[in-house]
């Protein structure tokens, strides 16, 4: 029930301190996430249900008997933190970088945790994406808004992970540039979640859907010259063309070749081990926010 309500309840140990955390999903677009979060510092490894009051507990779960709450997965990871600060024009930018390495375990299933979280402490959000893009140029970083809780739920129930982010409603009075941005964000966010889920389970249909979303995004970028000058999206289109040039023929051949379909997950992992996909995703986000 917590998963359906987009809520995660966690107990964490940090040294000798236990921390009870409640998280609820806020806005999430194309790998960039805003989450509501409450922390309580406790003396022992036991939920304090009194902390889960109306100030933080979702109304959708008001009838849930909190005494029945039981853990369904656990995470074991080490976090390393660093603060990065620099000047951007006349403004100061401060970002907290957290590297998490470990695993999430649900029953007999487990998945590796290897996450770099960048949190803007001070400055313009555009600076955060600039830093992420610089890192992604040298490291195989893949923007993804899946939380550790979602990873645990997915191990417990593989069908719990939603590959399509919520679509924004377009109205007749929506300006052309607003409609363009909404569609582009949806296609980009969906492609990222499809890539993550295909990496996880290797289901062929997800790879086909990933390609289709990228092809739709490429069509969108090339079709609205009046709303978006083509020169501004040239580098983005070239990067997307390179991705499509490699993957469209592979997927087309794989539709009629079982051997190629079986080889595709390993090829895709190879793609994710390079910088191309992550850098394209981040640069697309930067372009849409510009």
Regions found by a protein language model. Give the residues of each.
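Function-determining surface determinants
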Residues: 1-290
